[in-house]
Amino acid sequence: MLILGASLPSQVNTNWQTYIMIAIYFIILLIIGYYGYKQATGNLSEYMLGGRSIGPYITALSAGASDMSGWMIMGLPGSVYSTGLSAIWITIGLTLGAYVNYLVVAPRLRVYTEVAGDAITLPDFFKNRLNDKENIIKIISGLIIVVFFTLYTHSGFVSGGKLFESAFGLNYHFGLILVAVIVIAYTFFGGYLAVSITDFFQGVIMLIAMVMVPIVAMLQLNGWDTFSRVAEMKPTNMDLFRGTTFLGIVSLFAWGLGYFGQPHIIVRFMSIKSQKMLPKARRLGISWMTVGLLGAVGVGLTGIAFIPDNHIKMDDPETLFIIMSQILFHPLVGGFLLAAILAAIMSTISSQLLVTSSSLTEDFYKLIRGEERVKTHQKEFVLVGRLSVLVVAIVAIAIAWSPNDTILNLVGNAWAGFGASFSPLVLFSLYWKKLTRAGAISGMVAGALVVIIWIAWIKPLASINEIFGMYEIIPGFIISVIVTYVVSLLTQHPGDFVERDIEKVKSIVREK
């Protein structure tokens, strides 16, 4: 999660050339949105999932861009700058989590969502997988998505508004509205196809930025000797283990557990044209992620030497990338690099808007209007999907209008909330035949509650014992797994169709 608040130092200047680059970037996004709109046929599955026709390259980079958000460009460099190389453990945990997600979840989820009634949302898949005729699990999981993603989306709008405030000295609300209008436009009209293509485009920009800035900074300093100097400035800067503990490392690693339950990421697997394309997507996606994260660490480490060398007073470490990009490069290039920050922020906003819209349309409106109506009134449901994008965005903007630190801190824990409530359920749904509806609901609710309780009442006790300060996804995930397993063994199995479906899924996944 990216929170920008500090103004930039006086050494950082922006001019008309920077504005031109930002304007070009916005125009390209709108053109892609228009392309997505022209390609649309009025089919709900196409609007929400691209008609399951997305290729491996767009799948890989759009998944990465929507996942990393402004955290990779702003948050991680700031963390490395503040704490040194020990911050790298979270990047290792995330990379391993993403790799396992591609390997274990992606193939089966792509096939199973189609086998199980051609589900286009995660709650719809849970409902079909567990034969939930009362739609209880669909409603509960849909509510979790709508509530938490609305808050998640608002944090993205706050980041966009504060970027314009910090980098350009513009009014926060002007920046907020500008970012919102562009994102809403291409998401509203272009749907999933436009969101995926823009995320691909934005993923390319982010990667270029994360390669350029640390390399140029290192060349301006002392080449490879920069890292020796960083270590001399403070020994813990280049030490993987100093400044952290075993439990701290485990907590950072545990971020990887969240991948299996993030709706805006795993929906990319559901939309790919064929599960046979997933190995190619995995290779590209993990390569993109590895290079990008290493670049972010490089920005943080070189920044430790760069900031004092240039006599810069930096109040907020999260502005490190902005400062370095504007001092090191020509305004045109600096504008491109600022566009990379916007790309990171907007790619996540658009993905979350669309997932929330999908849930409102597929998991709630469809229940009200009836399953049969979808077949004969596709355009009505596409219109509802578009209006849902607008409604969610307006609510998120309203919350973001007066940023509240308490809300932003809550949003920062949403990854753990989704990870603890959805990750075990996704894995059990794909691999365990004995999973029951009661087990799924109990485990999902238990995981979410443990995360909330841990954040509200247990984490404040960290000063008493370090174990209370562990990342909340760890106890949430463990409790969710135990509850799901035990309750499923004690309740009625959904039926023989589950075994048939899982065997069919396994057979299709094995096809080369």
Curated annotation (Swiss-Prot):
UniProt topology in membrane: Multi-pass membrane protein
InterPro entries: Na/Glc_symporter_sf, Na/Pro_symporter, Na/solute_symporter, Na/solute_symporter_CS, Sodium:Solute_Symporter
Location(s) in or outside the cell: Cell membrane
Gene name of this polypeptide: putP
GO cellular component: plasma membrane
Cited NCBIfam families: Na_Pro_sym, sss
Record CDD domains: SLC5sbd_PutP
Reactions catalysed: L-proline(in) + Na(+)(in) = L-proline(out) + Na(+)(out)
Taxonomic source organism: Staphylococcus haemolyticus (strain JCSC1435)
Transmembrane segments: 16-36, 54-74, 85-105, 139-159, 174-194, 200-220, 246-266, 288-308, 327-347, 381-401, 410-430, 438-458, 467-487
Protein task: Catalyzes the sodium-dependent uptake of extracellular L-proline.
Keywords: Amino-acid transport, Cell membrane, Ion transport, Membrane, Sodium, Sodium transport, Symport, Transmembrane, Transmembrane helix, Transport
Protein name: Sodium/proline symporter
Gene3D superfamilies: Sodium/glucose cotransporter
Pfam families referenced in this protein's UniProt entry, alphabetically: SSF
GO annotation (BP), single: proline transport
Methyltransferase found in the keyword field: no
Family affiliation: Belongs to the sodium:solute symporter (SSF) (TC 2.A.21) family.
GO molecular function ontology, one term from the record: sodium ion binding
